[in-house]
A protein has these predicted regions:
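Non-transmembrane, aqueous-exposed alpha-helical and coiled segments at domain scale
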Residues: 1-424
Length: 424
């Protein structure tokens, strides 16, 4: 397990943060390689409960170097606030254990504003953005209209670059949205405040990673969101604006020569989704409310109630294939303990035809779930620590899912704490 990626198989919120936190004692470096502050990785440890939006989940482990790669949307303001929150809880964060790629682009204040303005313009056709500026940021990045973190180390160049970007961006704000533009003084003040606080962490992380790889260091690549939110392979356009698949890890981390030895895909024992778009197995009413409360399904970033339903084996199998998962961590099995029978979406029916293949996005609105049911176990399993001590019905459920998705389940979680993970 020299190089390992931990990725989401579904819509995100599967429990990747707790898996990274659990596995980091086996690794020397943890790298976030895509996304920004639009999603949260929840970690529960002896220092408390934390929702990490930008910081890699290895930040709690002594001796682990954490890196924000070039593929990350670097929001200096939110990153600094997150650092200070963890420091207040007794977590040591220094340039020795946190490094920011000099090639990471900065998410600027206007990106968040443009995100909110566009969602308001779309009205009932909105995508369900978290309004953290992610889509405008990546749009600017691919238009080569962003500032690199390394420019914080070259203030005269940065000032001239910002002036060029300011003129261009104000045209969009004022003429497209009728909003107020920014002044150079406002932008400079933000850079002088938050950019200056992040500047000590900026480094040539590609050189660091190459040296680490040459010295046989073990590297863990941490993804955000899941395969169904991937820009290219997800449920477009209800996706994020970056690539959440494991194949992007070498590129977004700053180590394009990296070979992944293992890909751990994280799957929740039921389905959950934040945001708009097709969600074939969605429950509503009291049924949804009960599952949502049992699983504490509220967004780590927004606090919004998540959409929930039974596990979708069609979508999960597709996610496993897109991620190239070599093993699976099945999380939140304990949440299903209240059910007398456990529903699973085994197939889809589209226009009267049953299928096991995940369809092209436009067909998902016509897809209906074909359900199967398994016996429940109806007892508290949160204290179980060995596979053989789980109720037979719980083991049967895991084995059924494993066979249906075609990938071995190596980990089963029955709680949020580090120790509540069962190894098979």
């Amino acid at each position: 397990m020299a190089n390992c990626a931990i990725v989401g198989i579904n819509w995100g919120d599967e429990g990747k943060g707790r898996m990274v936190d659990y596995l980091t004692d086996r690794f020397d470096v943890v790298v976030r390689y895509q996304g920004g502050g639009n999603a949260g990785h929840t970690v529960v440890n002896d220092k408390g409960k934390f929702a990490l939006h930008l910081l890699p989940s290895g930040i709690f482990r002594e001796g682990v170097v954490n890196i924000l790669g070039n593929g990350v949307a670097l929001d200096c303001e939110n990153l600094y606030n997150e650092i200070e929150t963890l420091r207040a809880a007794g977590v040591a964060i220094t340039p020795e254990n946190l490094k920011v790629s000099e090639r990471a682009s900065l998410l600027l204040p206007w990106h968040r504003e443009l995100d909110a303005l566009e969602e308001a313009r779309l009205k009932d056709k909105k995508y369900g953005s978290t309004k953290q500026g992610i889509a405008p940021f990546y749009s600017d990045k691919y238009q080569k209209k962003t500032v690199l973190a390394g420019e914080l180390l070259h203030p005269e160049h940065l000032k001239a670059h910002l002036a060029d970007l300011l003129e261009w961006k104000n045209l969009t704000l004022t003429r497209v949205y009728g909003a107020k533009g920014y002044t150079m003084d406002e932008l400079t003040a933000w850079i002088d405040d938050f950019g200056a606080k992040i500047k000590p962490f900026v480094a040539n992380t590609t050189a660091f990673l190459r040296e680490a790889q040459a010295n046989g260091k073990r590297i863990l690549f941490e993804a955000q969101l899941g395969a169904l939110r991937d820009l290219d392979y997800g449920i477009y356009p209800y996706t994020t604006s970056s690539n959440a698949i494991a194949a992007y890890a070498p590129v977004g981390s700053g180590l394009p020569t990296a070979k992944l030895d293992e890909v751990v895909g994280v799957v929740k024992a039921y389905s959950s989704c934040v945001g708009e778009g097709p969600f074939t197995c969605e429950w509503f009413g009291d049924e949804a409310a009960k599952l949502r409360e049992a699983g504490a399904e509220f967004g780590a970033k927004t606090g919004r109630p998540r959409r929930v339903g039974p596990i979708d084996l069609v979508a999960t199998r597709y996610g496993v294939e897109m991620q190239g998962a070599t093993s699976i961590a099945l999380t939140k099995l304990d949440v299903l303990s209240y059910m007398d029978k456990i529903p699973l979406c085994a197939h889809y029916e589209i226009d009267g035809v049953q299928t096991d293949d995940f369809p092209f996005p436009v067909l998902l609105d016509r897809a209906k779930p074909v359900m199967e049911y398994m016996p429940g176990w109806q007892c508290d399993i949160s204290g179980v620590r060995r596979w053989e001590d789980l109720p037979e019905a719980a083991r049967s459920y895991v084995e059924y899912v494993e066979k249906a998705i075609g990938c071995p389940i190596g980990y089963v979680s029955v709680g949020a704490e580090r120790e509540s993970l069962i190894l098979r």
